[in-house]
Every structure is written in structure tokens, then in C-alpha cells.
Amino acid sequence: MLTVLAALSLLSLLTSATGRLAPDELCYAEPRRTGSPPNTQPERPPVIFEPPTIAIKAESKGCELILLDPPIDVSYRREDKVNASIAWFFDFGACRMPIAYREYYGCIGNAVPSPETCDAYSFTLIRTEGIVEFTIVNMSLLFQPGIYDSGNFIYSVLLDYHIFTGRVTLEVEKDTNYPCGMIHGLTAYGNINVDETMDNASPHPRAVGCFPEPIDNEAWGNVTFTELGIPDPNSFLDDEGDYPNISDCHSWESYTYPNTLRQATGPQTLLVGAVGLRILAQAWKFVGDETYDTIRAEAKNLETHVPSSAAESSLENQSTQEESNSPEVAHLRSVNSDDSTHTGGASNGIQDCDSQLKTVYACLALIGLGTCAMIGLIVYICVLRSKLSSLEFWRAQNVKHRNYQRLEYVA
């Protein structure tokens, strides 16, 4: 019984794993071409190799910029070079729509695949509709959710010959009383059925999330459509069939990717900036005397005087990254702004759970102690029963012997 209870407590800890927001260093809107650039087309299309084996929960609200991370433990692996790929999908139920895909080559075996830990990486296939809403940061999916992004995201990872799949159920708060335009998302097309609320009677900080620093209008003038994976608007004048079809989805057995994915040849840092550009260029909803500058100042003030646990997690991420190259830990996690146990995922793409691992190890120790105690108890009972049986047998033999002697004496 003790073992069962300990196992259940361990399972509850694992299934309640939480995560963090994207760190501040990913909230920018200027075009950056730092780091290693991609240099080849992907060798394979994005594929869901097997149905998801893990169910995870995630949350988002306001203008938060989030990272969905596949929690895969690579720390136990050898340093031998391996190839890897990461694919992200959105599950519409009848089909799975690919969102982003990237391949890595010659990666350090016990480090999270990234442009820094791999010899090379492919162009990124991303879903674009004139703007970049999603991109991959190492192995994580980066975006600013709208209220219509609530739903199931699926990750499919191939690490050497090992397959990892999971389902992240994202729940976006429907309160739209924030300055950013939250009326967008993957499920908004065709059937807008999510109730939005503007609850001014329940005041809360509006400057919650990512507010990139304003940039010059010509900053992106030298960036090509090809680098961002955005189709040239001029090409649509001749053939309207080139427009991406949002309903073009994957089945479990599909091995080809549809027109919803475009090949972005720019480096990872450029695509992160493109996501920030979409945030900066969206239709803002200011109230009263609010301006973008006042909102940014308020957001910084909130971070300074009322640090959220997500911000604390980001700081912990930076310190932990120097000690460890971001092992991803137990194959369970979610994004939740009030958790500070996941570290390292900001810069390395997948988070560890050092604090949570300590708790898990404690539970494992309890399971081990309980198992040993039960085994010892069983052995003790068996030995005791054996001794009692031997004693009873000896007594029976002794009585029999005395009776035999009495009969002999009578005779």
C-alpha cells in the first residue's frame, strides 16, 4: 500500500509540471542576424511519427509571449553527434495542421539541439499568412497567443532514432481587457465561437506580457520575403491559388506538408524578431491616456516592483544555464506563469526542472524505502512462520516420542 501511495504521489507531481513565459531577451522587434545561419533545405517533411503519448497543460493571458517546450531528457545521453528534428502541429480533431518544422545536424548528443550546439541546421518551415506569428527557438514554439489559440498543440521530435511525441493543451484567458489585440488565433477562421470578455469591473494590470522596443520604419527594409518565409504579395496578383489554405491539414499517416508551411531561410534570431514585429505592428487598444510608451513603462515597473514568478523563473533560467546545458527532464510539462521550477529553457529551448526533480527523487526514495520495508516485512513473516512451523513440528514429534515411550513402558 505504501508503494502504491508513493507511486501515485509521484505521478501527480509529474502531471502537474509547469513552465514559464518567454524570457525578455526574446521580446524584440528589430531584425537580428546573429548566430549561425541555416544552410540547407529540410531533408524530410514534418511528420507525427506516432500518436502523442504525453498530455500536458499550458496557460496564457494578456499580451504574454510564451514558449511551448518539449520536455525531453538528453542529459543521460552520450556526447556522440546525432541528428534531430522538431515539428509542431495544431490539432483540429479531424486533422493536424503543421505550424513549424526544423532539422538539426551533428548535434552534441547530451545537449539540447540548437544553432549553437549543432554543426548545422535547416531552413525553418513555418506557417505564415503575410506575417510571422510562430517560430522555433531551438526546439520550442514561440508565439503570442490570442484567445483563438486555445487548443491542442502537438510536438513530434526525432532525436537520433528516438521518437518523442506529446500534446500540449493551451488555455488562453478570454479576458481581452489588455492593450494588445488578442482577437486572433488558429481557430478563428470560419467559425468564431469563443466568447471574449471586457471585465472592467475587475481591474487588473493591463501591461502584462511582451512589449518590444519601437524600431525605425525602415529597419526591415533589407530583409527579404524569402528570409521570413512570407510569400511575395505581388505573386498573388497572377495566381490566387497560391494563398495558403488554413484547412489543409495532416492526417496521422500524411508524409507531405501543405501550403500552410513556407520555407524561411533567415537565421533563428531574425525569425524571433519577426514575431516581435508582428506584436509591435498589431492594432493596439489603449484606454484613456494610455500610449505604447506608457504601457511599456508600466510593464517594466511591474517587473521591477511586483516580480512575477515567471520573471523569477527567467532569472533562474539564466543562472542555471551557466551550470547546465539545459537538460529537458521528465517528459511532462506545461507553460504556466506562476511556476519557477523550470530553468534553462529560455536560451536552450527546453527547460529543466531541477527543483521538481529533487521532489521526484525524494518520492522515488520513498518508493524505494517502502519497497524495501515491505520486502523486509515479508521476509520476516516468512522466517517467523518457518520458525513457528519448526517449533510446532518439534513439539509434535516430542509428544509422539513421549507417547511411544509410555506405550513401551506399559507393554
Curated annotation (Swiss-Prot):
Please tell me whether the keyword Transcription regulation is annotated for this protein.
no
Under InterPro entries, the record lists: Herpes_glycop_dom, Ig-like_dom_sf
Q: Would I find ATP-binding among this entry's keywords?
A: no
Q: Where are the transmembrane segments?
A: 364-384
* Region feature (Disordered): 306-345
Compositionally biased intervals (Polar residues): 306-327, 334-345
As given in the record, the signal peptide range reads 1-19
- List the glycosylation sites: 83, 138, 222, 245, 317
State the GO CC annotations: membrane; viral envelope; virion membrane
Report the Pfam families cross-referenced here: Herpes_glycop_D (PF01537)
Keywords, comma-separated and alphabetical: Glycoprotein, Membrane, Signal, Transmembrane, Transmembrane helix, Viral envelope protein, Virion
Give the domain of life: Viruses
Location in the cell reads: Virion membrane
How this chain sits in the membrane, per its record, is: Single-pass type I membrane protein
In the record, the note on similarity to other proteins reads: Belongs to the alphaherpesvirinae glycoprotein G family.
Function, as annotated: Chemokine-binding protein that inhibits neutrophils' chemotaxis.
Write down what this protein is called.
Envelope glycoprotein G
Lineage, broadest ranks: Viruses, Duplodnaviria, Heunggongvirae, Peploviricota, Herviviricetes
The UniProt gene name for this protein comes to gG
